[in-house]
Every structure is written in structure tokens, then in C-alpha cells.
Amino acid sequence: MPDTQPNVSPNPIRRRGLGRDATVASICGLVVALMVGASFAAVPFYNWFCRTTGFNGTTQVAGVAPSSAPLARKVAVRFDSNINGLPWTFEPEQREIEVAIGQVFTAYYSVTNTAKHATTGQAAYNVTPLTVGSYFTKINCFCFTEQTLAAGETREMPVVFYVDPSFAADSENDAVKTITLSYTFYPVREPAPKPLASTAPDKRKGNL
């Protein structure tokens, strides 16, 4: 009489385990993909959110210097620099200065691309104490635009700012002796295209 092998059905517990593992792996892959995408989207979203809400010590922007004379009161301004995911070195030329309230001051940061190819970054920024953000005003800043550095390039980047005179009128700032301006450079995956140079003559000056 021929031997007969019993029918063995797959273990339902094992099948459930395999299905669960596949689901977990899919979720983990999705989370990693979202995290990678978020890292590149972080700077524009962060800047937009902070400008819109005033969150996290976001500074103000002005086109011109204040019309009033600087006040007698002074405050120390410290400069902080950080890099996240870029082959750059990034340092302030001065770590700390003292400025009068309402005085326009230009500070410089130095950045070097240590990679063997061009890279692009953009800086996120804030000031602390966070409540000072509404008084700390920038007229010009490298953080307003993307920065593309050639291989080995070093660049000096200015930031022109002042502390609004209304800072001194707010009693909550009486104890504030030091303001820290902090920048963190993040990589830009797809830099904005540079405009092509125009071949049309400059109508303001005519042909030279």
C-alpha cells in the first residue's frame, strides 16, 4: 500500500506574522522617505511658517534704517553659526559685539565649501530670547537667498541689522542684556535657476 503524505496546511500564525512584518517594513520605508523629503523642504517651510506666525524668535525685515537717533542704552549681540548636512565651514568674524538700540550695524560671517563640487545651501535663523524677534530687524542678510559655493570657495557674507528703539520701551526687555543671532545652513537639493544675462542695452544708460 503506497505511503500517503498528510496534507499540511500553512500555519495561519506564521502567515499573519509575515503579513505584519511586511506592513511594518512598508511603514518604515514610507517614514524614511518622508523624513528625507522633509529635510530638503525644511528650510523654505520653516522660513515661511516663522515669517507668518512670528514663531521661534523670527526676526523682522526693513528696507531702510530707523529715522530716529540711536538710544543711549546698549545691548550685546552674540553670533552663532551651525551647519546641517553640508560640507561647509561657517563662522562669524566676531563672536560678540555691543550696539546701541537703534544703531545700524553690519556683521560678517565667513563660509567655505570644502567639497570638490559646487553645493547650495540656505540659512534658517532666529534670535534668543525668542520674544526679542519682533524688535530685531534686518535690512540685508545672506539668509534671504540661496547661497551656491563653487568647490573650495570661501565667501564673506554680511548681515545688516538694528534693534528697534521700541525694544527699550517694552518693560519686559528691561532684563535683556544679550541677544543671540543664530543661523543654521541646510542643503538645497534643487537650487533655483539663475536668470540668463540680458543682451538688450540698458535703457537707463544707453549703449556704452
UniProtKB/Swiss-Prot annotation:
What organism is the protein native to?
A: Rhodopseudomonas palustris (strain HaA2)
Q: What is this protein called?
A: Cytochrome c oxidase assembly protein CtaG
Q: What does this protein do?
A: Exerts its effect at some terminal stage of cytochrome c oxidase synthesis, probably by being involved in the insertion of the copper B into subunit I.
Query: Mostly located where?
Result: membrane
Q: What molecular function terms (GO) are annotated for this protein?
A: copper ion binding
Listed HAMAP family: CtaG
Q: What Pfam family is a match, any one?
A: CtaG_Cox11
What membrane topology does the annotation report for this chain? Single-pass type II membrane protein
Q: Name one cellular component (GO) term.
A: plasma membrane
